[in-house]
Amino acid sequence: MEKIESYFVPFGRLLLAVIFIMAGASKIASGGAGMIEYMESAGVPGILFWPAALFELIAGLMILVGYQTKLVAFLLAGFCLLTGALFHYVPADQTQMTMMFKNFGMAGGFLFLARFGAGEMSMDNRASSED
């Protein structure tokens, strides 16, 4: 069982990272079509589209490889809480409320990474073992 358990953290990082990698890449590829208006309808300035899209992509990749994991996971936890509250708090819409709580659940996963780190199979661990 120990051998299998050694893959839990990197697999968990993959599961947490993939949504941000895909969302960031998709937003960048779309050039903001529809998203800027959606952001503005929630009271978020459209000028934040590009920084948010780049953050999603880069932060997702950093979590995937386990680089600067504690910091990036903390930032992603905040991002998930903020976007969940800003874009998905619609009490009359059960789907949006489910999306909000999904974001909050991901924030919980990121807080675990922020506290405990990326694990053995990560760039963070590789860098610390070379010191």
Walk through the language-model features, giving the residues of each:
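Extended, low-polarity transmembrane helix blocks
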Residues: 1-30, 37, 46-54, 58, ...
